[in-house]
């Protein structure tokens, strides 16, 4: 089976469109060390992981994605325990 590659996106700023700052996103940030982003529709999980690691100088443990009913792609990014999602949120200006 041929290996699939994601889109050729050079700049990590092009992958992550904007952070989500809803009540649920804040609860996930505090309880599960997860950040929530709206990302490009054609971005895959390895590309999202690489973009978050490059932009925020953190290590990512896991990425979950979904397509919202409005057609946007949402990514839940779980950071490794030695990094805090709240610190990244402060840098983003959402906390």
From Swiss-Prot:
The keyword Mitochondrion does not apply. GO terms for cellular component: ribonucleoprotein complex; ribosome. It holds the Pfam family Ribosomal_L23. SUPFAM superfamilies: Ribosomal proteins S24e, L23 and L15e. One of its GO terms (molecular function) is structural constituent of ribosome. One of its GO terms (biological process) is translation. Keywords: Ribonucleoprotein, Ribosomal protein, RNA-binding, rRNA-binding. PANTHER family: 60S RIBOSOMAL PROTEIN L23A. Part of the 50S ribosomal subunit. Contacts protein L29. Belongs to the universal ribosomal protein uL23 family. Binds to 23S rRNA. One of the proteins that surrounds the polypeptide exit tunnel on the outside of the ribosome. This is Large ribosomal subunit protein uL23. The gene is rpl23.
């Amino acid at each position: 089976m041929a290996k699939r590659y994601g889109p050729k996106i050079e700049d990590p700023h092009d992958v992550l469109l904007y952070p989500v700052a809803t009540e649920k996103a804040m609860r996930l940030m505090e309880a599960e060390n997860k950040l929530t982003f709206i990302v490009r529709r054609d971005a895959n999980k390895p590309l999202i992981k690489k973009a978050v690691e490059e932009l925020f100088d953190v290590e990512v443990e896991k990425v979950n994605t979904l397509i919202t009913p409005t057609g946007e792609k949402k990514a839940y990014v779980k950071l490794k325990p030695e990094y805090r999602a709240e610190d990244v949120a402060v840098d983003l200006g959402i906390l």
